[in-house]
């Protein structure tokens, strides 16, 4: 990625972590359709690989704003996709895709982080991977820890996430009736691939 700073990438990961960790409330719903968010999206679209995914997300947000009871409908989508059995869902856990659920714990220890007691989900939840990537990008931007060490950890985290993210995204596309979370997961996948190519 060329135009986005480490801090901006960190913000995108943190934002995605938040949206995948819990249902949207009214305030978040208003925020994603705001002019401020449109500016943020236009900044992301200045990164060519992200353009199509951001356009897709904006389209799903535009459709969302005309839905009756949008928040309740979206909550139902969230629940059906991420909290039910895995038969017709896209469970956001590494272990649901036969990956080592301990790997993220090792990466968190290496980064000097731990999961928050406020987040009542297993450590291998997608949001934890994204929070870790956000933290690492912020650290890269600050320059207080040697970049090589942070970069190595970022690469390990991306490698672990890329083991199961494509299947998660495919399941979002398959089972998300409305398409908001499918579009969100598509943006995440493109971001992760761009981040990975950064080396």
Curated annotation (Swiss-Prot):
Alphabetical GO biological process terms: protein complex oligomerization; protein folding
A GO term from the CC aspect: cytoplasm
Chief place of localization: cytoplasm
Alphabetical keyword list: Chaperone, Cytoplasm
Domain of life: Bacteria
Function per UniProt: Involved in the biogenesis of TorA. Acts on TorA before the insertion of the molybdenum cofactor and, as a result, probably favors a conformation of the apoenzyme that is competent for acquiring the cofactor.
HAMAP family (alphabetical): TorD
NCBIfam families documented for this protein: PRK04976.1
Protein family: Belongs to the TorD/DmsD family. TorD subfamily.
UniProt protein name: Chaperone protein TorD
Organism name: Escherichia coli O81 (strain ED1a)
Gene symbol of the encoding locus: torD
């Amino acid at each position: 990625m060329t135009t986005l700073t480490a801090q901006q990438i960190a913000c995108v990961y943190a934002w995605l972590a938040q949206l995948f960790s819990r249902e949207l409330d009214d305030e978040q719903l208003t925020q994603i359709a705001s002019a401020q968010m449109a500016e943020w999206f236009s900044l992301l679209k200045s990164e060519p690989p992200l353009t199509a995914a951001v356009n897709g997300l904006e389209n799903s947000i535009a459709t969302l704003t005309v839905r009756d009871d949008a928040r309740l409908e979206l909550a139902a989508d969230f629940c059906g996709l991420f909290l039910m059995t895995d038969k017709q869902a896209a469970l956001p856990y590494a272990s649901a895709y036969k990956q080592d659920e301990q790997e993220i714990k090792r990466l968190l220890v290496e980064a000097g982080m731990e999961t928050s007691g406020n987040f009542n989900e297993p450590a291998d939840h997608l949001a934890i991977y994204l929070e870790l990537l956000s933290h690492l990008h912020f650290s890269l931007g600050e320059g207080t820890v040697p970049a090589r060490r942070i970069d190595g950890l970022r690469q390990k985290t991306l490698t672990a996430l890329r083991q199961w993210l494509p299947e998660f995204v495919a399941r979002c596309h398959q089972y998300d009736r409305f398409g908001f979370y499918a579009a969100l997961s598509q943006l995440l996948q493109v971001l992760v691939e761009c981040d990975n190519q950064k080396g």
